[in-house]
Amino acid sequence: MILLNKKTKTRIKEQSIREAPSECCGLIVKNERNKPVVFPCENVSKEKEDNYRISPEDYLAASELGDIEAVYHSHSKEYHWD
């Protein structure tokens, strides 16, 4: 299990608000200092309001920064969490 600090949660929340009504998506990558880093990704789904699909280019770029620890996405039709 990964525990996210407040700064990380805030970055994901801000992305979800910016990209609404589309679902946002991204990856949590552990960098060389073993710290989790938010890596926002482009949602390339044809049905962005109901689904997400991370672009292969974003996945590759994130994997080059460190180990991918988690995938996140929003539920754009539901309440934004705090």
Regions found by a protein language model. Give the residues of each.
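Conserved beta-strand-loop surface patch within small alpha/beta domains used
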Residues: M1-I68, S76-D82
